[in-house]
Amino acid sequence: MINVIASIRVKGDKLSDFLEIFKSNLTSVREERGCIEYFPAVDIDADLPPQSLDENVVTIIEKWESLEDLSDHLNAPHMLAYKEKVKDIVEGVSIKVLQEA
C-alpha cells in the first residue's frame, strides 16, 4: 500500500475556490483503480505544541494499492483538467509518498 500526503498552499483568499474545484473531482478519483482513500483536510487548532497552523494549506490524504495506480491517477484526464483549473490559485505543492516501515 502506498500513502501520499500532499500539502497544497493556496493563494490568499482562494481556499474556498480551491476546495470547490477539488471536491468536484472527488468522485472521479475515488472511482479510479487502486484508490483506497482520498480526501482534503485543513488545519484545526488542537492546542498541541508544537503544532503549526496555516489557513492557506490544504493537506490531501491518499492511499493507493500500488505505485502504478498512483502514477495512473496523476496522469488521468480528470487530474490533468483539475491541475489546469487550479494552477492560478495554487502557490506551491509539497508531496510525500510513503510506505509502511
Please place each PLM-identified region on the residue numbering:
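Short conserved AdoMet
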Residues: 30, 65, 91
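Short, well-ordered beta-strand segments in beta-rich or mixed alpha/beta enzyme
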Residues: 2-9, 41-74
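Absolute protein N-terminus
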Residues: 1-2, 101
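Residue-level marker of intrinsically disordered, low-complexity segments enriched
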Residues: 3, 8, 34, 59, ...
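Generic structural motif
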Residues: 11-13, 67, 100
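Glycine-rich beta-strand-turn "strand-cap" elements at beta-sheet edges
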Residues: 39-56, 81-101
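Short amphipathic alpha-helical segments
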Residues: 14-40, 78-86
